[in-house]
Amino acid sequence: MTADKDKDKDKEKDRDRDRDRERDKRDKARESENARPRRSCTLEGGAKNYAESDHSEDEDNDNNSATTEESNKKSRKKPPKKKSRYERTDTGEITSYITEDDVVYRPGDCVYIESRRPNTPYFICSIQDFKLVHSSQACCRSPAPAFCDPPACSLPVAPQPPQHLSEAGRGPGGSKRDHLLMNVKWYYRQSEVPDSVYQHLVQDRHNENDSGRELVITDPVIKNRELFISDYVDTYHAAALRGKCNISHFSDIFAAREFKARVDSFFYILGYNPETRRLNSTQGEIRVGPSHQAKLPDLQPFPSPDGDTVTQHEELVWMPGVSDCDLLMYLRAARSMAAFAGMCDGGSTEDGCVAASRDDTTLNALNTLHESSYDAGKALQRLVKKPVPKLIEKCWTEDEVKRFVKGLRQYGKNFFRIRKELLPSKETGELITFYYYWKKTPEAASSRAHRRHRRQAVFRRIKTRTASTPVNTPSRPPSSEFLDLSSASEDDFDSEDSEQELKGYACRHCFTTTSKDWHHGGRENILLCTDCRIHFKKYGELPPIEKPVDPPPFMFKPVKEEDDGLSGKHSMRTRRSRGSMSTLRSGRKKQPTSPDGRASPINEDIRSSGRNSPSAASTSSNDSKAETVKKSAKKVKEEAASPLKSTKRQREKVASDTEDTDRITSKKTKTQEISRPNSPSEGEGESSDSRSVNDEGSSDPKDIDQDNRSTSPSIPSPQDNESDSDSSAQQQMLQAQPPALQAPSGAASAPSTAPPGTPQLPTQGPTPSATAVPPQGSPATSQPPNQTQSTVAPAAHTHIQQAPTLHPPRLPSPHPPLQPMTAPPSQSSAQPHPQPSLHSQGPPGPHSLQTGPLLQHPGPPQPFGLPSQPSQGQGPLGPSPAAAHPHSTIQLPASQSALQPQQPPREQPLPPAPLAMPHIKPPPTTPIPQLPAPQAHKHPPHLSGPSPFSLNANLPPPPALKPLSSLSTHHPPSAHPPPLQLMPQSQPLPSSPAQPPGLTQSQSLPPPAASHPTTGLHQVPSQSPFPQHPFVPGGPPPITPPSCPPTSTPPAGPSSSSQPPCSAAVSSGGSVPGAPSCPLPAVQIKEEALDEAEEPESPPPPPRSPSPEPTVVDTPSHASQSARFYKHLDRGYNSCARTDLYFMPLAGSKLAKKREEAIEKAKREAEQKAREEREREKEKEKEREREREREREAERAAKASSSAHEGRLSDPQLSGPGHMRPSFEPPPTTIAAVPPYIGPDTPALRTLSEYARPHVMSPTNRNHPFYMPLNPTDPLLAYHMPGLYNVDPTIRERELREREIREREIRERELRERMKPGFEVKPPELDPLHPATNPMEHFARHSALTIPPAAGPHPFASFHPGLNPLERERLALAGPQLRPEMSYPDRLAAERIHAERMASLTSDPLARLQMFNVTPHHHQHSHIHSHLHLHQQDPLHQGSAGPVHPLVDPLTAGPHLARFPYPPGTLPNPLLGQPPHEHEMLRHPVFGTPYPRDLPGAIPPPMSAAHQLQAMHAQSAELQRLAMEQQWLHGHPHMHGGHLPSQEDYYSRLKKEGDKQL
């Protein structure tokens, strides 16, 4: 007995030990599996498979044990002394199973079942019953026998598959070969339910929560304790048992508030069907019972007078009794009418048939019949008026439909909520009716409220079956799989020596260095201690860490090295590895993991906060694969677990160091993704963080697509989601950009790797990692040296796409990609050419980083993160091997840069991976170049420079880049400068290798870049500056500064204007060493970019996927020598660098000074404008007074003249030209108080100036045509003319019509007379004549007075020999038809149409002749001239009275002719021999009066003395020039085009006249 007692004691001790090990093992097993392993669907398949596997539990444990030796020791230490046994009833039924640890399992118990994979939690089930199966049935070879007490059979669980053994073969039916199996019914964890199903459940719960209290599942701990019961039964070996648990049932989510998250406790509310993948609650179960029924009081009808109860609220809608025959005839008639109406509306018989066959047509007919008291005749008469009822879709406005669809998406089919929140004007019944109409429309296919049942299997989290599992089994993996016991064996490590061997281990979650055993587990397969592993296996999540402990120093040595290397190797490697798996993972988005790869508390929070796939935190690709794509749309695959881990470590460290923990916690805002501390420079860090999002890969499906397309592996950052929305939008934009963006010259990109010669800017020193982008941020600054940076990661970074810097999202416009600064400076220079390609590249999207070629220059370690970027090199760039040569880089960069622009995605943030990791895509930070996008629109020349800009735009986060980023912010317009190609990207980098492609690009850019979206790039002038400075150094010297004429004069111009020439030069130099010579500190550069932006706040973000509501924090994030980086908005996990972060230059910095100067300048301009405005008002008042007086006089004179004679006006005041400005003469382009505008002329400016003219807007001058010239002797006389007709507009209308008819007749008569040889009028003699002395003058003058026919301002305009009869007729009728009642906009429109009509007159031979007279100075003079004569008629819009000279009418001629200083008509001036068309000449401001001495009178009083003097000088010079030109003109009459036969006589005479005069 004593021996037996001793044995029992020993057994109990052993059991205790085993129990502990078992517990550990269970927890380990449940560590981190993304998807639940397959479950066998055959009853005994699990046990059978397990038995056939012929392996012991020990062996399973050994597979995952820390070392082989330890495994061997474990095996040796497992004697068959630990016995498990079961109890039976007399009938042979097994009532309980007792393990060696004395844990008793009975049918009905809820238990944990081992899951084969270490990263998958235990499965949870309830035991239905036990049964013994003989080994022969299981085809199993039994291990060594174990012995047990006679009364029961023993099952040695730990060492071998349980076996029913009895010492002497006793035990009812027991034998050594028996296996104890159990039937279990599964419970599913939320991570084992398809994400699509669970998310809809969460949505429903949220929508139905009217209690005002938060649901219990908002607590992440309780959320993970919810299970879903199922009816699915499976058979497992008893050896798979890993402990007992408690599962409570609650009727609904509200009742679950009572649940307490105790140890081993769970709850369930709903059931789950693994076959259909549906939850009971969402599958339309029949909701019966008290909980689903409304509680209504009994009906209490109103008493009727006679005492009987009635229901007064019923409405009779049909009375049977109509004979079927009559009813059918009536319906046929109704349908016929409907068909006819449908045909009339739709235009085809088919439409009619559709209308007739609709149910609502029939219902409407029946309702009408009922309302007509069943009188078919009356009903049909009523139907004639409305045979077809108004369709439901016609009753809903577009806005209402949008709201309805929004409500469906937000609240599901909760129509009460939709009505309450979004459509209060509609009845709930209308919503339901409309829903059934809407769900049949094509739009509903993509917006269905709940399509959970149609989700593809792809989204399931259940993993693929293995060969051993039937394909159609939806259940858990066969028991054999579970018995693998991924965790170390349960009783291993018993001995001290085994623990000693493990002293070197440390848990990657809690960092403890003491544990019974060590096994990889958790969703990320990290090394865990026993406690953490078991907690994960039980609850599906790692335990929260209450007191964070610093990780042992030895844990992160490798990471530290990478960090130290800042070369970006680490990041690159990470990115590369991640990127390599560019495909999406099926699992939900991953959680970032802590440096050691463990899930940090932050990560844990993140994980708990959002549904993650079982392996959400897992970095390993395996895990992710296992994950079902719960949030596949939001998540990008993460490849290479290790790289990710290192990246994560870096990130985490940085987060803690830089207080970015918050960001990390909030899923590390995109900016933060890249650990700031890690980034070479803080600023860069920021930017890299933003990029890091890119690292993760945008979670946005679009982003993902882009990643895939780009072929560069997307770099999913742990926080993939964050970057999602923004980067996705941005990427989409980028994608939209022409593929060209890809930078056709990608090959050259690598070279830019900063020519070795170019010293990398010290500033950039730290930027080694992708962060370099930040340097780019200060692009010029560090860039020059850092060009090297690009060099640094020569190859790598060259390809670095700079994935879309954060800005990219903002930069949706092509040009942001424009200059992915990412390429080293040289790259930037090269970039210009590539830019075009960039455009095309757009598709690669921010993640395009791939450009596999990466120019993997071993090249410098690429201190910058850029190196990683190489991988960014778009696929197209892949060739960028050229990058290998730093100098070549320049070209290569171009292509690369092109690519980069394309992917400015914020992914840039990817932390600088050590250069060593060229493959890894550098964070797209480099993309800063994107920045150009916003600014690009300003100056093409900056293209080369833009790279830097792009950087800026893309890198808002990096402090150095701050200015740029802010710039980009300011320039969100970048979106508008869409095409990165802004230069005709057609320009080949090749233009000159020496010349950085960027330069070439600039050259290629059309100076007018601004004119086209593409130009947008050029327009980036402000941006240019940055690129110019920093990049130039990097780029090959060949590149000329954008400002240099060689490059592209236009681009240069803009860039120079926007920034110091030096910087411009640098920019153009791109990689030109000169850039350094223009000593623009990198910081400066970025500052300049900021300058451009001028505003610290970033512009509103471009459209992007939804993100958390931002909260204003305005906390300083990072500081550099010249600026401070502020975080303005906090969006939780999803942050946008362009709107959430901004730079503020430090007080003494150059940028601050520039901004102050800009502000001062703006103030001065505003004050000046205010003064001018006041002066203008005063002038208007004075002019109004004068106008009123003159109008009264003119009215009297007009009446007198009209009554005296049809067209003859004796009053010289009203001489033809007197009261009219030349047709389409734009009112003075500027106001007298404003100095003349010497610059290019634009129609928009002229139009604005017209509106600004005081007299134009004068109410008393409403009817004055803007194109009419003023009287030479009295410029304001015309202002009084409207008074003649203001009394009664209809009178004027009638008069105008009558006069027009009379004048036409007279003109025709005159034309006939003019054709007679004797009738000629010589201009020299005409000048001195008073208009009234000419017998025909009254007609011309009269027609001028009657504005519509306006033949011309000059009295003899219609009769000048220079006009052929047809031309005169046209001119007489050509004037715009202006009516008194016309509004100013209408008048302007009429005049514009008139100008266009006049453009057709250029076919006139004389007009063509005059076109030959265009001289180079015309254009120049036009600018001066048109702005000097402020209030005189502007020749640009002349033309009502004569052919519009191409030089006069900008609509007719090209830009060069926009401001031809004089009309093509003759000058009534003695200085000229045979004048051009006088009627046009007189309209010109210079010749508005007969003689120069009259000039002052032609200038409105508001004109200053200085302006008048200028005008006089200009007139004098113009007259002399015109006189000379006129002589030449008439000396070459043969140059005019052919003329009509009717003109032969006239032209022959004209030629003779010219000969005589000459």
Curated annotation (Swiss-Prot):
UniProt-listed InterPro entries: Atrophin-like, BAH_dom, BAH_sf, ELM2_dom, Homeodomain-like_sf, SANT/Myb, SANT_dom, Znf_GATA
TM segment ranges: none
Gene Ontology cellular component annotations, sorted alphabetically: histone deacetylase complex; nucleus; PML body
Sample GO molecular function, one term: transcription corepressor activity
Zinc-finger ranges (GATA-type): 507-532
GO BP field: branching morphogenesis of a nerve; cerebellar granule cell precursor proliferation; cerebellar Purkinje cell layer maturation; cerebellum development; chromatin remodeling; dendrite morphogenesis; radial glia guided migration of Purkinje cell
Subcellular location as annotated: Nucleus, PML body
Record flagged with keyword Ubl conjugation: yes
Record's protein name: Arginine-glutamic acid dipeptide repeats protein
Gene assigned in the entry: Rere
